[in-house]
Amino acid sequence: MLTTSKCNHNAYLMGYFRSGPGQTHKVEELHYAYSRDGLRWYELHDNKPVWTSSVGEGILRDPFIGRGPDGKWHLVYTIRPRGPYIGYATSEDLIQWTDERTLPVMMDIPDTVNSWAPEFSYDSIHDEFLIYWASSTGHDLSNSKHYCTRTKDWQTFTPTSMFYDPGFQTIDASLAEHEGKYYMAIKDESYVYEPLKYPHPPMNFLAVSNQLEGPYEVIPGIQTPDYTEGPEFLWVDGVKKWRLYYDYWAYGKFGVMESSDMKTWSSELAESQIRFPYRARHATMVPISEKELQRLIEKYALSVHYPTPTYSPVRIAAEESKGFLHEAFTMKSVRMEFLATTITGTQVLFDEGDHDNGLSMRIQDGLLEAIVCAKGMKLKIAGEHALLSLDEWSQAAVTYGEGTLCLYLNGTCVAEGHANINLVSNHDAAGGYGGRFGKDAFGDGDGKAALQGCIRNVRIYSVPLQAEDLKQMV
């Protein structure tokens, strides 16, 4: 994390690898999710890897991403086999990762067993990156301490030295600067190897220093719940608070606490307040620009784009049991531009599925309407009269996620509804845009109900786009 970490951002990226409870179902590669508030994180690329490491055994765990003063992104991560190396790569755009290699950070320390969960902070005073990680030396993993090195160019490094040793086993450190002080969240793992001497379960605690390099002193009375690890700080400018994220690795979930001053922390936020991708583990969170977020959404969440202007219904899915526009979903967005020559009657803009499981958007007697249905349960919303315009291009979008259905016109939300609906099940009806292709989600099946006008730039996304996203697209 940069020492100047309080930035005016409204977009955040999370990098993570995946596994189930207790290290099962492992997918040890780089994954992405994004958030607007730091609480609800939506997976990109359908929760599949966005980048795969080729060093060592091809394993990427505990990714940490940070931006340098030149705007370039740097990625460090845990690799296998165990030993004196960590993984490294750099990127201009968070999409193409280059210069992949191992960094021999513990090569000069005898009997190094492992080098785990590396992170770094940029030291603006010395124009250097401070890289820190946990290593154990000897015969096993029972004496992990934190070591560090410095670099200006990621090519040459200062001799490795001890960074933090509280006298017991620690891993998973993360640093942040707040009002001239440096705070460290770090996992106390002493119980794992010495349960009789340290009977309290593993958890994360906080320490503070006046200098980036330390020494750090423990802040009494602040810790995350039992059986947590992988702490990570993020400043969320919209609420002027720090969020501390941590991983219940054995239970397959995340927890979040928050503070405005790094001294007084909330209790753990309720699970209803947060959302994380399924099986996400040991994440890194970083603020990004609107331009960067939109590029990532277009790369990893855009399912299909139909740019050509059309004046009649376009079928994009046949009547069949599998394939595009037939798969179950919990999140989806459809965005299009249309020019209507009339707004009377029924004119279907988008038609997926049927009246049992489906999603649809239409013009109905001057109103813009949308509906989602799952196993026959329906959620229908409509905008107000006098919003639609004739003979000029407009942007319409419908978004769905976590039971919330939103309808947008020219980047402004005109209707929103919520129902106890999450999964829209597989559906085998034909579908498309600019008209109806069977019995639609509204329950109507009388003819094509074609748009009287033109449609162009139809885009379907695998995430529930938000108002800020759509405004960037207008």
Question: Residues of each region from the PLM?
Answer:
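Extracellular glycan-recognition modules
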Residues: Y311-I371, K378, T404-L405, G445-A449, ...
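Beta-strand-rich interaction surfaces with strong enrichment in secreted/lumenal proteins
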Residues: P220-G221, Q273, S321-L325, A382-L387
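Flexible glycan-contacting loops in extracellular carbohydrate-active proteins
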Residues: G417-C454
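Short, aromatic/His-centered strand-loop micro-motif at the edge of beta-sheets
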Residues: A370-Q395
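Short strand-turn-strand beta-turns centered on an Asx-Gly dipeptide
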Residues: Y408-G411, E416
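Carbohydrate-active catalytic/glycan-binding domains of CAZyme proteins
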Residues: M1-T308
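Localized edge beta-strand/strand-to-loop motifs within extracellular or lumenal beta-rich domains
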Residues: E392-C406
